[in-house]
UniProtKB/Swiss-Prot annotation:
It comes from Mycoplasma pneumoniae (strain ATCC 29342 / M129 / Subtype 1). The lineage of its organism: Bacteria, Bacillati, Mycoplasmatota, Mycoplasmoidales, Mycoplasmoidaceae. Keywords: Cell membrane, Membrane, Transmembrane, Transmembrane helix. One of its GO terms (cellular component) is plasma membrane. Coiled coil: none annotated. Its main location: membrane. The keyword Transmembrane applies. This is Uncharacterized protein MPN_465. To M.pneumoniae MPN_037. It is a multi-pass membrane protein. It is found in: Cell membrane. The keyword Transmembrane applies.
């Protein structure tokens, strides 16, 4: 069934986007204790401990859509200041530390444009995030295969677009998730490291 989703990547991405947005953003309080949707998708309650209501909804609602939002939405010169000011620096988020460090006009432009929007930084960050993600999925023991098929393939499809990985890498990693999940963390980290340092 997983390869059927891969054959139609766009519709699969839109489906996961709607599920994540409905699950994480519209019901953030239910996410704390593991909602009904998470139990149906075999997501363990231990993964539902972060209160996502304190984070910007526009960024959380697209956790796997880096290909569409990374360049056009977050990394645009005009939107960078608006994103930091309106979402991160909103009144329900504002504190002394946030206003002084993140919400300053100078820091917002430098941090968003130079750090997040640089291709090298994006790839380096994605390497550590992906390595932590797949190590976490592997540590789920009995639930690792089901949870990996649901979240891992979605992340691989987006990382495949973000890091310009070969098309066969998505099929390779997806197959390893279902048949040999213990080999996934090493191969993913090796492939992304090789692609990152070959800029």
């Amino acid at each position: 069934m997983a390869f059927l989703f891969i054959s139609n990547e766009w519709k699969y991405q839109q489906l996961i986007f709607k599920i994540n947005c409905w699950h994480f953003c519209y019901y953030p309080k239910n996410y704390l204790g593991g909602s009904i949707l998470s139990k149906r998708l075999f997501i363990p309650p231990s993964a539902c401990r972060i209160d996502l209501s304190v984070f910007p909804w526009a960024f959380i609602c697209s956790p796997w859509n880096f290909c569409s939002t990374w360049s056009s939405l977050i990394c645009s010169p005009c939107f960078s200041t608006v994103w930091v000011s309106l979402l991160i620096c909103s009144p329900w988020r504002s504190t002394t530390w946030t206003n002084w460090l993140i919400c300053s006009p100078c820091f917002s432009t430098v941090w968003v444009n130079l750090l997040i929007c640089s291709p090298w930084a994006a790839k380096v960050v994605s390497i550590f995030v992906s390595r932590w993600l797949f190590e976490f999925l592997y540590s789920l023991n009995s639930l690792r295969v089901t949870y990996s098929v649901f979240t891992g393939i979605t992340g691989l499809l987006s990382l495949n677009c973000l890091l310009n990985l070969p098309e066969n890498s998505t099929l390779l990693f997806s197959g390893l998730m279902m048949y040999q999940p213990e080999k996934v963390p090493f191969l993913v980290f090796f492939t992304m490291s090789w692609n990152s340092f070959s800029l």
